[in-house]
Amino acid sequence: MTYDFITVMDRRGKDALAVDVIPFEGAEVAEGFDRIPMWVADMNFATVPTIQEHIVNRVNHPAFGYFEPSEEYYNSIINWQKERNLVEGLKAEYIGYENGVLGCLAAAVQSFTAPGEAVLLHSPTYIGFTHVFEDNGRKMVLSDLVQDESGVWRMDYEDMDRKIKEHKIHFAVFCSPHNPTGRVWEWEEIEKAMEVYKNNDCVVISDEIWSDLILQGNHHIPTQSVSEDARNRTIAIYAPSKTFNLAGLIGSYHIIYNPYLRDRVRKQSGLCHYNSMNVLSMHALIGAYRPEGHVWVDELREVLTGNVEFAYQHILEHFEGVKLAKPQGTYMLYLDCEEWCKKKGITLDELIKAGIRVGVIWQDGRPFNRPWAIRMNLALPRSRVEEAFRRLTEYVFA
């Protein structure tokens, strides 16, 4: 490989929530175990060097005044979308900066719904969506994803349509790839979902922040690409932050083709929160989307695919009673621990604490709307993933 995904990086004291925080009250790591961060969705790999190079090059100039996004910024996004997602016809005017995916979601829901109105989401549900809608006084209506005979998560289109009609919904969130299940939707699935939204006149916001992190053998389909109607009713959100581990630099972008949607989202973004770009974030994106970034992401996908395959097989062979669907994208596992916990007579709280006690810092999955779930991050060097599962096998699931 061209880039290093093997070295174990020491992030302590370097502004890293993943290693500085234990995300479960009352849990502690026992003496003799170091922390293996497997919770918050960022990566324990060094990012592609061109990002640092672009930032350092800009920092070496001693003025940091007001600025506008450069032509290079927009062209970097246009070229990235064309090469990675086969997007044609994208222009700078359709692209808009956002401080984050959730900031754009907040602006969109304020633009197209009123307090007290309902919005449709799928469940399991990314916890960030929940916070946005609760904070903005909107009612969340959940359409459960269901697992087929092979355990693959599927949308229930009849349930979606019924709930949209019952609650008079005109705003829907579509997460593609889906977080936390890791499902990468196929063309026909997206097409059917968009037909439901079209028939019920819903504005759709499509969170595609994970779209670069598709495991090998799968392919991301941009929601806006499945039809002309989808192109015109969808607000799509992307970001280099998830792909290149840049969450601490802040910065994402929307793609909105429909001027009616675009004008309102941009106006509301400026009203509801400070939504101006940081100059270093701009240069980070430009550095990320260079040719070297394409190579880095392709190698990362290979590493993540291997980690997921290892973890999936290990769980099937050693953690009897723990259920999971094999993810097709993201680097997260979403474990259903109900059968195991009930068989052992322990609570999910006790299981989570047992893992943390041996240094496996995993995440309570219940806030994502499944009562026996744990979420695990596999974006670490393979040696750390293997060590985590060794500890879980020896000390927790024994």
Regions found by a protein language model. Give the residues of each.
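N-terminal small-domain helix-loop-helix segment of the aminotransferase-like
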Residues: 2-100, 107, 291, 398
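Conserved core of the PLP fold type I
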Residues: 60, 64-195, 212-213, 220-225, ...
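Short strand-turn motif at the edge of the Rossmann-like AdoMet-binding core
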Residues: 208-210, 239-240
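PLP-dependent aminotransferase class I/II
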Residues: 233-317, 323-327
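Conserved PLP-binding catalytic core of the aspartate aminotransferase-like
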Residues: 304-305, 318-357, 374
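PLP-dependent enzyme catalytic core of the Aspartate aminotransferase-like
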Residues: 344-346, 353-398
